[in-house]
Regions:
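Residues forming the flavin
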Residues: 2-67, 74-554
Length: 554
């Protein structure tokens, strides 16, 4: 894909982003736009013919007594306008805005059969969508269910503890992100991110995801977005198959593959493997095919829950509850100790979800609806795990990484009573000198896992290694110094958070093909090339571009 300006004068001149417009909470849109106009005027720019609109919005809560909203504004000049000097814009704290198109030059090599995309998470979805949009008629498969059936399976597990290992919080339409906060924030600097957001908006996501600096969709809305995207893939000539797990494949002399699936054999011209970070049997199958995989560092830990109103007050003080602020968010980290500790996937007004995908394990994750108005707020508190912490299994460090996760998940299952209840401990007990005992039952903050009905008091160190527990204690105390009250004794810890990222990477080359395996394209978070919805979607786009640039449409 070439991300080129539509016209030279557009790139250089016709639009600018005016940054750093700080206003009090409650300021009107008109006031924000007026400040942008004033900023342009101070640079000697005539604003009479310019069009101004809000571009990005963020909350600056570094000072609780003076919380500010910080905006960027897009200023656009009409046709025929002389435009803006980049030198002048730089002095103003502004920058040129480049209206970018997604332009892909198609290859000419014949594709011997339709492309197969394995996995319906963000990477697989966006890869299949772009392939379908460009006329390649992909086949998209997932081991799990369609959205509605998947929601029913997850609800059933929460209600009665019957786990469907093929359709759950990890597997099915939309991937693990379907049961999350639907965060779209990413740290990658790639112009494709804007294309991802715009596509999600067209598929039914709220329009404010374009404006917000920390956009989120919410699990309730994201489910509809995923279904709309799948429908669009079919409308564009693609095919979607559920309950279709990839168990193996054969390569043929003519360059085609036969994918061995639970729905039978599928002939394809290439395979995009976007399995998600929990497809452990897929990793093992790929190892058996002599593909090159490597273990990578991960993080493990717990979910911490506070009352949402407490967290709002901790971060926003007297401004807590203001409609311009919403439920408070945080991201905390400390790398000064023995291991890095950080919060991850913070879910304001959300719940802790039962995220197991294998029998006899307990895994936790977080989820919020669009409104973020639940009783509790939660986040992972995770500790860095090094590859040196893994013990090889059958001579494989990749299998050792998976075994490391499984040991913790199995320990959490046993600590919870072996009925898919979650082991919980108050922060007070965990930080106490007798942290190996869970003495105090939850009182002020109640666990939200499986509706709050299935939990058991158990010390965190029954689930996690001592070196992880020591780092968690260090991290909680550090975070409490940054956000007073974070380590309040009544807060609840639920174990175990183990699926923060993929424990392995499927090696690929500059052509995006797996090393030594032309025609197989590892993709997304499960392949080790992304972390989160937006970056996984971007990686799916990149892989689709690689396919499109190499082959002509079917």
């Amino acid at each position: 894909m070439d991300l080129n300006p539509r016209a030279a004068e557009n790139a250089r001149c016709r639009a600018a982003i005016v940054e750093g417009i700080s206003v009090p909470v409650g300021a009107s849109e008109a006031e924000v736009l007026a400040r942008a106009e004033q900023k342009m005027k101070r640079g000697g720019i005539s604003v009479g013919s310019l069009h101004f609109r809000l571009y990005k919005k963020s909350v600056d809560a570094r000072k609780r007594e003076d919380i500010r909203l910080v905006y960027s504004v897009l200023a656009t000049a009409p046709e025929g306008h002389r435009g803006f000097s980049e030198e002048v814009l730089a002095r103003l704290g502004a920058k040129p805005y480049r209206d970018l198109d997604l332009q892909i030059e198609k290859g000419t090599a014949p594709l011997p059969a339709r492309p197969l995309v394995v996995g319906m998470g963000p990477a697989g979805l966006f890869c299949a969508y772009l392939l379908a949009k460009e006329g390649y008629a992909p086949i998209l498969i997932d081991r799990g269910d369609a959205v509605a059936d998947r929601v029913a399976a997850v609800d059933g597990f929460c209600r009665d503890g019957r786990l469907d290992t093929e359709s759950n919080v990890q597997f099915g339409a939309g991937g693990a992100g379907t049961f999350s906060d639907g965060k779209l924030l990413t740290r990658i600097n790639d112009a494709r991110c804007a294309w991802v957001l715009e596509t999600l908006r067209r598929m039914g996501a709220p329009s404010d995801i374009i404006l917000q600096a920390k956009p989120h969709v919410g699990t309730d809305v994201l489910r509809h977005v995923v279904q709309n995207m799948l429908d669009s893939i079919c409308d564009l000539g693609g095919e979607v198959i559920y309950r279709c797990r990839l168990d193996g494949f054969d390569r043929h002399p003519d360059g085609t593959f036969t994918a061995k699936t639970t729905k039978g054999d599928i002939l394809c011209g290439l395979m995009v493997i976007a399995p998600g970070h929990s497809a452990r049997d897929t990793y093992k199958m790929l190892l058996g095919k002599q593909m090159m995989l490597e273990a990578k560092p991960i993080s493990v830990g717990v979910r911490i829950e506070h009352l949402r109103r407490d967290m709002d007050t901790m971060l926003y003080g007297s401004m807590a509850g203001h409609p311009d602020l919403g439920a408070a968010e945080y991201h905390l980290s400390d790398t000064k100790g023995e291991r890095g500790v950080y919060t991850f996937c913070m879910c304001p007004g959300g719940e802790v979800v039962a995220a197991a995908s294998e029998e006899g394990t307990v895994v936790v994750n977080g989820m919020s609806c669009r409104a973020r108005d639940g009783l509790n707020s939660n986040s992972a508190v995770a500790v860095s795990v090094r590859t040196s912490d893994y013990e090889p299994v059958d001579g494989s460090l990749v299998l050792g990484a998976i075994a490391y996760q499984r040991r913790i998940e199995r320990a959490a299952y046993l600590a919870g009573g072996a009925d898919y209840s979650v082991p919980v401990q108050t922060v007070g007990d965990f930080l106490d000198g007798a942290g190996d005992r869970a003495i105090h039952a939850p009182t002020r903050v109640m666990p939200s896992y499986r509706g709050g009905a299935y939990y058991r008091l158990a010390p965190v160190n029954q689930t996690l290694p001592d070196y992880i527990c020591d780092s968690l204690r260090y991290g909680l105390r550090s975070f409490d110094r940054k956000v007073k009250g974070f380590a309040m004794p009544e807060a609840i810890l639920s174990a175990a958070e183990t699926r923060t990222s993929a424990p392995v990477r499927i090696l690929r080359g500059a052509d995006y093909c797996a090393v030594g395996c032309p025609g197989i394209y590892p993709c997304g978070e499960g392949a080790g090339y992304a972390g989160g919805i937006t970056s996984a979607a971007v990686d799916g786009i990149k892989v689709a571009e690689a396919v499109i640039s190499a082959y002509g449409p079917n």
